[in-house]
A protein has these predicted regions:
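Short glycine-/aliphatic-rich beta-strand segments at the starts of folded cytosolic domains
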Residues: 1-12
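An amphipathic, aromatic/His-enriched active-site/gating alpha helix that lines ligand/cofactor pockets
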Residues: 29-36, 55-92
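Short, charged/polar surface micro-motifs in flexible loops or helix N-caps
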Residues: 12, 47-48, 54-60
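Short, low-order "capping/linker" segments at domain edges
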Residues: 85-110
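A compositional/biophysical signature of low hydrophobicity enriched in polar/charged and small residues
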Residues: 9-11, 64, 80, 104-107
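Short amphipathic alpha-helical segments
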Residues: 10-37
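Short, surface-exposed charged micro-motifs
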Residues: 40, 51
Length: 110
């Protein structure tokens, strides 16, 4: 399972609006086209955390579908609520991705 964690800033009180945008989008074809199998949204003060889970790295599909009407639409709708974590250093979506520096999994051997 591949996981990507997107980090950004979010407007105060915007969590319900952001959730609604994704709820509507997740009923469409976009998650299937990108390969998303699970999405979780988190908030810590004004920090927006978006965990995307998929069978493989979705970056190539996201790059390919960046011009797709649904992708552009969700990006435009989110722009009212979500901004770059550090606008001075943001150049592309990869600049919003957190870097995993540790992972542990329980050994399932009994």
């Amino acid at each position: 399972m591949h996981q990507s964690l997107i980090v950004a800033r979010m407007a105060p009180g915007a969590a319900p609006d952001i959730a609604k945008i994704f709820e509507e989008s997740d009923r469409g074809e976009l998650p299937h086209l990108i390969g998303v199998s699970r999405r979780s949204l988190f908030q810590f003060d004004d920090v927006y955390l978006h965990l995307v889970e998929s069978e493989r790295d979705p970056t190539p599909a996201i790059t390919k579908l960046a011009g797709h009407p649904e992708f552009r639409g969700i990006s435009e709708r989110l722009s009212a609520y979500v901004t770059a974590y550090d606008p001075a250093t943001w150049r592309s979506p990869k600049d919003a991705m957190a870097n995993r520096f540790y992972q542990w999994e329980r050994d399932n051997r009994s």
